[in-house]
C-alpha cells in the first residue's frame, strides 16, 4: 500500500501573514517541523508540500517533494476537501495523510499509529484530537450539560476537539464520502 503525506501551504494567511515560513521558537521555519515528522514516520512513502507559490520551495526539506497547486485553491471559500481532491487527481496513493504546518509538535509515532489503524482496514480514516471533559457553552447557552442539574465534571460526556495534526484516509473512503473523514474514523 502506498501512503502519501500532503502538507498544504498557503503563504497568504489573513490572520498571520507568511506564518508557514516564519521562524518558530528556535529560529526554524514553522513548516520544517511537520515535514520532519512526516519524513521520520516509517509508514509514509512520499511527502509533498502543496502550494501555489513557488517561493515556498526555499523551505522544502530534502526528501520532500514540491507540487504546485492551482491558485484558485488559495481562495477564502476553499475547504480542505477541495484541495485534497485536486491533489489526489495528480498524486495517486492508497492512503493519504493530510498534515498541517500549524502542528509543530506532531510526532512521527502519532502519524504512524493513525496510518496503521487505517491500513488495518478496521477504520476508513483517522484524525488526532484532544479529549475534553469540561463545561461547554455556545451563544451564552450550555451545550453539554443542564445547569439546573449541574453534573460533576467526571459525569460530563467526553467531547473530542480536532487538533489538525494529521488526517489519514483511504482513497476509497475519500471518493465514497467526498471528505477526508469517512464513516468509521479512528480518533487518536
Question: Where are these predicted regions, by residue range?
Answer:
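Conserved core of the sugar-phosphate nucleotidyltransferase
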Residues: 82-83, 104-186
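Short phosphate-binding loop-to-helix
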Residues: 48, 54-97, 105-113
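A short, N-terminal amphipathic alpha-helix
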Residues: 29-47, 58
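Residues in the short beta-alpha loop(s) of Rossmann-like NAD(P)-binding domains
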Residues: 27, 51-55, 131
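N-terminal nucleotide-binding beta1-loop-alpha1 segment
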Residues: 1-17
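Hydrophobic targeting segments
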Residues: 2-7, 31, 46-49
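Short, high-confidence coil segments that cap the C-terminus of an alpha-helix
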Residues: 44, 93, 122-124
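Short glycine-enriched, charge-decorated loop/helix-capping segments at active-site entrances
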Residues: 19-25, 71-73
Amino acid at each position: 500500500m502506498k501512503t502519501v503525506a500532503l502538507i498544504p501551504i498557503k503563504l497568504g494567511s489573513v490572520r498571520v501573514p507568511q506564518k508557514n515560513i516564519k521562524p518558530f521558537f528556535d529560529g526554524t521555519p514553522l513548516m520544517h517541523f511537520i515535514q520532519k515528522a512526516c519524513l521520520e514516520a516509517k509508514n509514509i512513502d512520499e511527502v509533498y508540500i502543496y502550494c501555489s507559490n513557488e517561493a515556498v520551495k526555499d523551505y522544502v526539506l530534502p526528501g520532500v517533494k514540491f507540487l504546485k497547486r492551482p491558485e484558485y485553491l488559495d481562495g477564502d471559500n476553499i475547504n480542505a476537501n477541495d484541495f485534497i481532491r485536486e491533489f489526489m487527481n495528480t498524486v495517486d496513493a492508497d492512503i493519504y495523510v493530510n498534515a498541517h504546518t500549524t502542528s509543530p509538535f506532531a510526532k512521527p509515532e502519532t502519524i504512524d499509529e493513525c496510518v496503521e489503524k487505517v491500513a488495518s482496514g478496521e477504520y476508513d480514516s483517522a484524525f488526532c484530537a484532544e479529549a475534553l471533559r469540561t463545561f461547554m457553552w455556545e451563544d451564552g447557552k450550555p451545550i453539554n450539560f443542564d445547569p439546573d442539574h449541574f453534573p460533576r465534571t467526571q459525569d460530563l460526556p467526553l467531547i473530542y476537539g480536532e487538533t489538525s495534526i494529521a488526517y489519514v484516509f483511504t482513497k476509497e473512503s475519500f471518493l465514497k464520502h467526498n471528505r477526508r473523514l469517512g464513516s468509521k474514523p479512528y480518533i487518536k
